[in-house]
Amino acid sequence: MSIYTVFMENTATGYSAYVPDLPGCVAAASTLDETRQLIKEAIEFHIEGMRINGEPVPEPTRFVEQIEVSV
């Protein structure tokens, strides 16, 4: 099992998500819950396709931190 960093963004019609360690792996939906489910499925499908094509599957390398600043 691997844990990939997923960036979620608000859009005009809902939410979008992408995985920096898996270029091209994206999802979008009208709700956050649906976007989470779709990006999970997209990651699994993306990795499965890479394995079928004999491509190396990248290990997760990115992480996110939130830093509080007083401005």
Residue locations for each model-derived region?
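Short, charged, surface-exposed hinge/linker loops at domain edges
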Residues: 1-5, 37-71
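Proline-centered helix-kink/hinge sites
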Residues: 20-23, 58
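Short, surface-exposed helix/turn micro-motifs that flank interaction/cofactor sites
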Residues: 18, 36-37
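Active-site micro-motifs of SAM-dependent methyltransferase domains
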Residues: 13, 24, 45
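A short, exposed loop/beta-hairpin motif centered on an aromatic-Gly-Thr core
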Residues: 23-33
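Short aromatic-glycine-(Arg/Gly/Cys) micro-motifs in beta-strand/loop hairpins
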Residues: 7-19
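Structural detector for hydrophobic anchor residues on beta-strands
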Residues: 4, 15, 25-27
